[in-house]
Amino acid sequence: MVTIRLARGGAKKAPFYHIVVTDSRSPRDSGYIEQLGYFNPVARGQEVRLHMNQERIEHWVSKGAQTSERVGKLLADFRKQNQA
């Protein structure tokens, strides 16, 4: 099954996550099919905290991809943010 989930990057105690499409059986940070955005939980000042390619996410969901619980919450936040 194809999943949209977070892949961790960044340094120790400074996490940075890529939002990726990957096979659900593959390890968290291994290769992925497509990168759809990023999430920076420790963004400061003018840094962008969350960026997603919403069009591509909708494309993958229409093809049957499942979003992880956290990505689903981030997607809802992103939609609220862009709606306002």
UniProtKB/Swiss-Prot annotation:
GO terms for cellular component: cytoplasm; small ribosomal subunit. Keywords: Ribonucleoprotein, Ribosomal protein. One of its GO terms (molecular function) is structural constituent of ribosome. GO terms for biological process: translation. It holds the Pfam family Ribosomal_S16. It comes from the Bacteria. PANTHER family: 30S RIBOSOMAL PROTEIN S16, SMALL RIBOSOMAL SUBUNIT PROTEIN BS16M. Belongs to the bacterial ribosomal protein bS16 family. This is Small ribosomal subunit protein bS16. The lineage of its organism: Bacteria, Pseudomonadati, Pseudomonadota, Gammaproteobacteria, Chromatiales. The gene is rpsP.
